[in-house]
Amino acid sequence: MTPSLGYWLLVYAAVAIIALIVLIARYRLNPFIVITLVSLGLALVAGMPPSAVVGAYEAGVGKTLGHIALVVALGTMLGKMMAESGGAEQMARTLIEKFGEKNAHWAMVCIAFLVGLPLFFEVGFVLLVPIAFTVARRVGVSILMVGLPMVAGLSVVHALVPPHPAAMLAVQAYQASVGQTLLYAIAIGIPTAIIAGPLYAKFIVPRIQLPTDNPLEKQFLDREPRDKLPGFGITMATILLPVVLMLIGGWANLISTPGNAFNQFLLFIGNSVIALLLATLLSFWTLGIAQGFNRESILKFTNECLAPTASITLLVGAGGGLNRILVDAGVTDQIVGLAHEFHLSPLIMGWLFAALMRVATGSATVAMTTASGVVAPVAIGLGYPHPELLVLATGAGSVIFSHVNDGGFWLIKEYFNMTVAQTFKTWTVLETLISLVAFALTVGLSYLL
């Protein structure tokens, strides 16, 4: 590919993203249709063979939905059981009691930081969002006041803190120490989550006016109040089961011999889909039968909670299709090649590569994996003394500027019932704050070591 053609690819991609935003935000066109049309148009303009365009888009949608559809469905069922049984109400009461109503946003960032450790962002989100809705209602604040701190905690853990799967990929690539990375990540992650979560929420929420009618909120809150609520312990155990199982799966090769039957069993139950499935089945007993619901009621709950997730699932899949087009058209390769032209320190290179890949692909995990794979050989060759900081810098870059090609962007938009413009002002800025603050703290830490 000639340099001029490569630069034009970047121009085409930028125009496509701008067109996407304008058509959805300004002209109020259906987001799924717009993403599909823009993705196919970009592929054709970028020179992809017409016969391969639809296949590439379908592959991107299918790959994304193959995981996300199951996660959203199972997580929504688990959330519905928490809501109907009063488990979410019990957790909300306990959190408010311990932290106080004025500090509910601090409670949400703390629980997200803990629950999100072994979970991909989407899994943690669907697990915790019923609690966020319930806390917001009880305290009488906008869902954004507790929801933004929640997603800040989840995102910080996703980007920085092992044993989260995304962070572990970078730890392996850079040959970093898990223990030291964990220590540095906590030191950097806590202030980052505070700034991007509770503090930013206090600033932006008064400036965002949400519609009063939120169909997704209704399915968690519009129910008859129950006299008897499940205990906090059993509710917490149910929601933490997938967390524990995924932690076990993440450490399977360290606590068992790779390849043997026990190791395979641990990897199986530690898979996010299996872990959520087991937790959902457990909730049918702990939050269903044990609370006086019969099988017909549980069937009704699980059926009615899925309909509102259809649009979310489609939008997340469409974002995956756009992601695949950007990769197959050569846009991501061009970004990597362009960044190679600048001779930067490994720390800056790790952040910059990850940031560019994040903007291009929409996936924090893909950005972290790709960037660490590119930068690690350079850093190792230069003998960079602190590979743990490279993990953190790469993780910080991987969450910058979430926009329309990121499934998480649409997940946040739909669940919190925001417009595209409001999602940029809240979620996109929050993610960018996490990236910049975490990177600044990482650079600062590098001068102290």
Set out the residue ranges of the language-model regions.
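Long, contiguous bundles of hydrophobic transmembrane helices that form the permeation core
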Residues: T2-Y7, L183-K300
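Membrane-interfacial loop-to-helix junctions in multi-pass transporters
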Residues: Y7-V11, G62-I68, L95-V109, R138-V146, ...
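Hydrophobic core segments of alpha-helical transmembrane domains in multi-pass membrane transport
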Residues: Y12-I24, T36-V45, V72-M77, I111-V115, ...
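Core transmembrane alpha-helical segments of multi-pass membrane transporters/permeases
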Residues: I33-T36, L40, A56-E89, F268-G330
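Hydrophobic alpha-helical transmembrane segments of multi-pass integral membrane proteins
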Residues: A69-G75, K98-I131, T313-G319, F342-P377, ...
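Alpha-helical transmembrane segments of multi-pass membrane proteins
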Residues: V72, E101-L117, V139-A159, S177-P191, ...
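C-terminal transmembrane helix pair
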Residues: F99-K102, P346-L449
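Membrane-core helix-loop-helix motifs of multi-pass transport proteins
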Residues: T134-V243, F409-L445
